[in-house]
Amino acid sequence: MKKIITLSITFCIWINFYSQNAYAFFGSFNRDKNKEGIYVYKLDTISGKLSKVTSYTGVLNPSFLTLSPNGKYIFACTESKTKNGGSVSSFEFNPENKSLKFINKQKSGGENPVYLTSDKSGKWLVNGNYTEGSVSVYPISENGKIEPLVQNLQFTEGSVNPGRQERAHIHSTVFTPDFNYIFFPDLGADKIRAYQFNNESKEPLQPAEIPFTKTTLGGGPRHFTFHPNGKFAYCIEEMGGAVSVYGYENGKLNNIQRIYTHPENYKDEYESSDVHISPDGKFLYASNRGNEDNIAIFSIQNDGTLKTVGYQSVKGKHTRVFGLDPSGKFLIVTHSGSGTVVVFKRNPETGLLKKVGRKIKINGVSCVQIRKY
């Protein structure tokens, strides 16, 4: 009997250890600050089921979220195409009592903020403004408060598409794995801009030795990610419908491949959006909107190049952002067009995806970030 009890206790401890609390944070285009804007769901790390925990009402269009390194604070872009209407906001999340509390906000320093990220020290927040083509840098205090901006980098030049590239359009702000540099894919200029980063400086961003890398003309670089080994980087091109692969070393990018995210017979307009790599570094996932509404799946070779594995319907409309949970077991897709969220279970051997559970309804959902606590 004692042996059975001991085994039961051990099993319960094992289940508890491998069922750490994981939470999915969703941003949205709520169009009205008197409606829910940020949502928090608990992710069952065994079944993939999402259960609503809390939400926040009182913020307009928190379309993109990022978390502080310790997961205590959530930062949101509050998107606005009105001159000086955008802002960046800070919230505190308490996983013990499941609460989400507003801390403060600052002006975004440019029109239409769309992406922001925190450095590993948690002392700095970097925001990209799409329409105005600028980047704003903010100190973060120990209590999660966003201080007034200390740098505002403005870019102007456009590229070959007069309808989409009349000027610079910063679409993401991504640190290198060592946090010595940060890259800004500029959809409007067909460039990936590079800056050195020093978290001890009062103005932490300075131009890199190579200030930008040119991308395919008319491709429109959008989102950007690094391989876990830090040797390779991947940029998805919204208008080019492709992922460009780069070798990376000390702030420098070297293009080694460009591969389409659509089947060869695809003839419609490209609307590629987001890109992520599985935690084990074996597979890359790229989302396509428009008539495709799918995720392209690629295997990653030893030299960083990609091979197409297949395509998975996202079971919804207009996938702006998706995310992988820290274990790599689940991939969560947001559909801003249909206002739905779908969870897929990932096969770690093949990279293929299988829908699990039911769709979650979140009006205007546009972003997801996932973290274990």
Task: Describe the residue ranges of each PLM region.
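Short loop/turn segments immediately following beta-strands, especially the blade-tip
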Residues: Y41-G48, F91-K98, Y138-E147, Y195-P204, ...
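Bacterial Sec-dependent N-terminal signal peptides
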Residues: M1-A24
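A short beta-strand motif characteristic of beta-propeller blades
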Residues: S51-T57, K101-Q106, E157-G163, A208-K214, ...
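Beta-rich, blade/repeat-based domains predominating
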Residues: K33-N34, V59-P69, G109-K120, T156-F179, ...
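Asp-box/WD-like beta-propeller blade repeats and closely related beta-sheet repeat scaffolds
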Residues: K98-S172
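An edge-strand/N-cap motif at the start of beta-rich repeat modules
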Residues: Q20-D44
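Short glycine/acidic-enriched loop and turn motifs that connect beta-strands
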Residues: N30-K33, E79-N84, T131-S134, A189-K191, ...
